[in-house]
Amino acid sequence: MNNSGLKIIEQPSPSFDARPQGMPIDMLVLHYTGMPTGEDALARLTDIEHEVSAHYLIEEDGRIFCLVAEAHRAWHAGISYWRGHKGLNARSIGIELVNPGHDFGYRAFPEQQMVALEELAIDILTRHPIPSRNVVGHSDIAPTRKNDPGELFDWRSLAHKGIGMWPKRAETGPRNVMDALKTVGYETLDYSRALAAFQRHFRPSEVQGIADPDTLCWLQGTVELVERMG
């Protein structure tokens, strides 16, 4: 599974299949469970009738469960798109963070949980060629369907630990907002929801799907960061 010293609890899920031959593992997708308790989430993710899973689940107290081996395709992303690729289960590792979500009392992610995520993510990144711009949330890759891990998730702190990216705010916005969102990686069939997904990740203080000046400056800063990455 991995070669690290992390304490990981094996809780196998039957909901997985083979990755396409030769497909790189070059994405890390973060979710929240969106269920009342971690026990509820673990039960669903390991129940074949629901046909949903992730590679890992992290409880609020920091316990890490491995549900699907990284070599296999877990079923967590659903209909998804990022940087020209679709069907992202094939190329990603999925981590579920226990959190009630917006339907059951959304709340901040505890420190123990975030520390466990940082340790697990760093371990994953040492073993797979995942660029920082491919560390994303479920809402980034499915903006019309999902809003997790949501506006309370601390992407900035994670990026400062070497997991994902965080831009500097530009002084002006992009010339074309749609093109800018595409450059970052978003599918823009629904412009407002794509912009809201960007806000959840990079400007979470106000998520309304409207191109206000502050959002545009953060968007331009993200474009500039992505372009420097090549």
Regions from the PLM with identified roles:
Residues 3, 9, 86, 106-230:
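Basic/polar, cationic surfaces and motifs that engage anionic cell-wall
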